[in-house]
From Swiss-Prot:
It comes from the Bacteria. The lineage of its organism: Bacteria, Pseudomonadati, Pseudomonadota, Gammaproteobacteria, Alteromonadales. The active site is at 103 (proton donor). It comes from Shewanella frigidimarina (strain NCIMB 400). Substrate binds at residues 88-90. GO terms for biological process: cytidine deamination. PROSITE patterns: CYT_DCMP_DEAMINASES_1, CYT_DCMP_DEAMINASES_2. This is Cytidine deaminase. Coiled coil: none annotated. It catalyses: cytidine + H2O + H(+) = uridine + NH4(+); 2'-deoxycytidine + H2O + H(+) = 2'-deoxyuridine + NH4(+). The keyword Zinc applies.
């Protein structure tokens, strides 16, 4: 079991803890598939709702908040029945807008794993306005069930009434929908190819600046992040932050990063290079490789 879970596992009832420990192996990054979750529920003797709440300390153990020292864990449950944990991330010494919220982390975890709809969000503290707005960007976002400790389950529409969202800006294909934009790639570099593939899956309906980041560690492993925009603009999730959240969730260290690539569209109304460089340079002494590529028409 990973050391980061040693304290949180003690907060669980023994039957659930015993069933969960084998899942917390070195490769565990917060993903529990539907069959594994069913096994945990059976072993615990509790309801699904109770087990989801019990798992929140495990999700919070994925956090990296050097500024606030306030650990928030979240779990996104996909329509597949799989669970995707996420936690807050703060960059040391950097402006607070670089932070990743736990709900964003969990949602991005699900998105990168191929989920096309989130049906439940479980979180140990009430979602802030930023996160409520980000969730409203998702497929059927207003219908997502929000589960909080000691509170009645309510939909996002309850927490974000009279919401402003994608439809107000004539966007009919929200975040998590299956979509792919193809881009020109004349490189045989596997990392560049991966970045362009991820870029094609990014979500940028307001700026057309499809973008992605790929980080490579010393052992050759790669961790990606896609750009995910919000109709409210400010809650948009940057690809560098998503990649860093992905890295930390996988129990890797910033010191392991040896290469970082940002690719973005040539037809975008903005560029993310400045924001990506600021975030990267806060945690690793390496240069950002930046590429601008053209979309394939047709």
């Amino acid at each position: 079991m990973q050391n980061r879970f040693l304290e949180s596992i003690t907060q669980l009832d023994k039957p659930l803890a015993n069933a969960l420990v084998p899942l917390l192996h070195d490769q565990f990054c917060g993903h529990i598939d539907a069959s594994q979750f069913a096994g945990l529920v059976k072993a615990s003797g509790k309801t699904e709702q109770q087990v989801l709440m019990d798992l929140l300390p495990i999700a919070a153990a994925l956090a990296n908040p050097p500024i606030s020292e306030f650990y928030v864990g979240a779990i996104a449950k996909g329509s597949s029945g799989d669970l995707y944990m996420g936690a807050n991330l703060e960059l040391p010494g950097e402006a607070l807008f670089h932070s990743v919220h736990a709900e964003q982390s969990a949602i991005s975890h699900a998105w990168l794993s191929g989920e096309t709809e989130i049906v439940d969000i479980i979180v140990n503290f009430s979602p802030c306005g930023h996160c409520r707005q980000f969730m409203n960007e998702l497929v059927n976002g207003s219908k997502i069930n929000i589960h909080l400790p000691n509170q009645e389950t309510q939909t996002l529409a309850h927490y974000l009434p009279y919401a402003f969202g994608p439809s107000d800006l004539d966007v009919t294909v929200p975040l998590l929908c299956k979509r792919e934009q193809e881009f020109n790639c004349d490189s045989d570099d596997p990392m560049i190819i991966e970045a362009i593939d991820q870029m094609g899956l990014s979500y940028a309906p307001y700026t057309n600046n499809n973008a992605a980041v790929v980080l490579e560690t010393n052992d050759g492993a790669t961790f990606c992040g896609r750009y995910a925009e919000s109709a409210a603009f400010n809650p948009s999730m940057q690809p560098m932050q998503m990649a860093l959240s992905n890295l930390i969730r996988n129990n890797r260290q910033y010191s392991e990063i040896k290469r970082a690539v940002l690719v973005e569209s040539s037809v975008g109304k903005i560029t993310l290079v400045g924001a990506a460089m600021d975030a990267l340079h806060a945690i690793a002494p390496i240069e950002l490789q930046h590429m601008v590529v053209e979309p394939l028409l047709g």
